[in-house]
Curated annotation (Swiss-Prot):
Pathway: Purine metabolism; IMP biosynthesis via de novo pathway; 5-amino-1-(5-phospho-D-ribosyl)imidazole from N(2)-formyl-N(1)-(5-phospho-D-ribosyl)glycinamide: step 2/2. This is Phosphoribosylformylglycinamidine cyclo-ligase. Transmembrane segments: none annotated. The keyword Transferase does not apply. GO terms for molecular function: ATP binding; phosphoribosylamine-glycine ligase activity; phosphoribosylformylglycinamidine cyclo-ligase activity. GO terms for cellular component: cytosol. It catalyses: 2-formamido-N(1)-(5-O-phospho-beta-D-ribosyl)acetamidine + ATP = 5-amino-1-(5-phospho-beta-D-ribosyl)imidazole + ADP + phosphate + H(+). One of its GO terms (biological process) is adenine biosynthetic process. Its main location: cytoplasm. The lineage of its organism: Bacteria, Pseudomonadati, Pseudomonadota, Gammaproteobacteria, Enterobacterales. Its EC number is 6.3.3.1. It is found in: Cytoplasm.
């Protein structure tokens, strides 16, 4: 009888020991994100979280997102430390526009071959994003799937749940003629438009690590982590009558602003109210990208757009400025039955 080789999971490309080593590496940073409502620690079959007692009629708000092909750029440049912040930001910023306070976050990390150092760097970034937004990292899934991804390439997805008082949900229904639009500045392209970014780099034959822009590598501008606005916006909501908030993500101005506008209203954006950050000017020039396409693909320096009564505008700008945001009046809401929901002039 011939002796057959005894195969193991590791022979098939799945290293359980590496997965366990990763869990040991991240326990400390995950613990720092813990909210008092969270029960139990990492390792359970499910994460338990009570609702904060201050809510009378709590409504749960959920969201999921990724970071798109910004991830490819980060892998090519071997810079993994801020991708986790991007992942959290894309989820929690979507929650806060409805007035929701993020409660907990889960991540999904999939790779062809688990590199513990890379994964730990990404998850440390996720924990940092959770700290910035005040939510707990309660669990996640690390999937090592040989044959599904090339080598140590990886993908990440995030899932977040928040809570808002039912009577305080922000849904855009209060937006009306005469409202003022306040902009909160972005940190860069955030996590959208990176397939176009990468195409521009390819066509222009630009090395983002050796090309300088405003005294630092272009790569620093392109990989700047997505700004997390949660804590500052929650404070704004407590002090100002906010009618609507739009998170400028994929689809830019043309797609995201109409999502919070009632029928028969139009957002009029004053293009002269701000200057695009240098990275957007570089992208437009290097890629010969039209103005319309820029506003459809990128945030062009505007991460959040907030609609509120004109009488509250100065107060809102002062409060956000005091909190470190770059805030300014960017436009107004007009009554209109036009099919053009957004006008930039």
């Amino acid at each position: 009888m011939t002796n057959k080789t005894s195969l193991s999971y590791k022979d098939a490309g799945v290293d359980i020991d590496a997965g366990n080593a990763l869990v040991d590496r991240i326990k400390g940073v995950v613990k720092k994100t813990r909210r008092p409502e969270v029960m139990g620690g990492l390792g359970g079959f499910g994460a338990l979280c009570a609702l904060p007692q201050k809510y009378r009629e709590p409504v749960l708000v959920s969201g999921t997102d990724g970071v798109g092909t910004k991830l490819r750029l980060a892998m090519d440049l071997k810079r993994h430390d801020t991708i986790g912040i991007d992942l959290v930001a894309m989820c929690v910023n979507d929650l806060v526009v409805q007035g929701a306070e993020p409660l907990f976050f889960l991540d999904y990390y999939a790779t062809g071959k688990l590199d513990v150092d890379t994964a730990a760097s990404v998850i440390t970034g996720i924990a940092e994003g959770c700290l910035q937004s005040g939510c707990s990292l309660v669990g996640g899934e690390t999937a090592e799937m040989p044959g599904m991804y090339h080598g140590e390439d990886y993908d990440v997805a995030g899932f977040c749940v928040g809570v808002v008082e039912k009577s305080e949900i922000i849904d855009g229904s209060k937006v009306t003629d005469g409202d003022v639009l306040i902009a909160l500045g972005s940190s860069g392209p955030h996590s959208n438009g990176y397939s176009l970014v990468r195409k521009i780099l390819e066509v222009s034959k630009t090395d983002p690590e050796t090309t300088e822009l405003e005294g630092k590598p272009l790569a620093d501008h392109l990989l700047a982590p997505t700004r997390i606005y949660v804590k500052n916006i929650l404070e704004l909501i407590e002090n100002v009558d906010v009618h609507a908030i739009a998170h400028l993500t994929g689809g830019g101005f043309w797609e995201n602003i109409p999502r919070v506008l009632p029928d028969n209203t139009q957002a009029v954006i004053d293009e002269s109210s701000w200057q695009w950050p240098a990275v957007f000017n570089w992208l437009q020039t290097a890629g010969n990208v039209s103005q319309h396409e820029m506003y459809r693909t990128f945030n062009c320096g505007v991460g959040m757009l907030i609609a509120l009564p004109a009488s509250e505008a100065d107060k809102a700008i002062a409060l956000m400025t005091a909190k470190g945001e770059n805030a300014w009046k960017i436009g107004i809401i007009k009554a209109s039955d036009s099919d053009e929901r957004v006008v930039i002039e």
